[in-house]
Amino acid sequence: MILDFEESLRAFRKGSPVLIYDFEDREGETDIAIPAIHVGKDEVAMMRIDGGGLICVAIHPVAAEKLGLPFMHDVLRIASEKLPEIRKVADADDIKYDSRSSFSLWVNHRDTFTGITDVDRALTIRRIGEVVDEVMMGKKVDFGREFRSPGHVALLRAADKLTYERVGQTELSVALAEMAGIAPAVAICEMLDAETGKALTKEKAMEYAEEKGIPFIDGRTIVEHYRKFREVEVSLFV
């Protein structure tokens, strides 16, 4: 198992997976994280079989804003004005691990069939990564022309200040991508345990990382390095 932070960056730059563990006092979960632009059917199968959780794409807040991707709780709140029966669902404030979730829209690429197969989800995820890269480079993209909703890939909108504001897997994976200098869109999937019916323990996730030769990194390490990264960036422009 590789614990070195630089190895995690190198893996992301090559399009290889990294295992990210958040915090003991938060979800206490490990996610498989793969740069979206490098996701193919084999990567989707890996996340589906070895991870078992929800396959999502975490997106940088700047890209999400440019693409017009809202938080789902905002969509539900607005919808509840005309559909009052969903107000209680939209106003839920009892999330156990955070003050709010990062869910945005669920989408399929328009060239998919059902959208759920490994091939279909890979196309959706990979193209999301490419679109995020394009808008971060200043190109205008018509998101609705390529994607439809609802779909089978959940989009996650990272908090505006990333790990300075929230330290979920969404922000941790996007911060790692930003530090790696790649398109800040990352496919993530929770690792679950079929025997216990719960999240895979940190110890078992580390054993998996050791067996597969995949870098394993925790949230605290990412938060610390991202703070240093941002401080260096700011100093360059002062």
Swiss-Prot record:
One of its GO terms (cellular component) is cytosol. D-ribulose 5-phosphate binds at residues 26-27, 31, 166-170, 190. Pfam families: DHBP_synthase. It comes from the Archaea. Binds 2 divalent metal cations per subunit. Magnesium or manganese. Keywords: Lyase, Magnesium, Manganese, Metal-binding, Riboflavin biosynthesis. GO terms for biological process: riboflavin biosynthetic process. Mg(2+) 1 binds at residue 27. Transmembrane segments: none annotated. It is an enzyme of class 4 (lyase). Its cofactor is Mg(2+); Mn(2+). The record marks 152, 190 as: Essential for catalytic activity. Gene3D superfamilies: DHBP synthase. It catalyses: D-ribulose 5-phosphate = (2S)-2-hydroxy-3-oxobutyl phosphate + formate + H(+). Its EC number is 4.1.99.12. Belongs to the DHBP synthase family. Homodimer. HAMAP family: RibB. Catalyzes the conversion of D-ribulose 5-phosphate to formate and 3,4-dihydroxy-2-butanone 4-phosphate. This is 3,4-dihydroxy-2-butanone 4-phosphate synthase. It comes from Archaeoglobus fulgidus (strain ATCC 49558 / DSM 4304 / JCM 9628 / NBRC 100126 / VC-16). The gene is ribB.
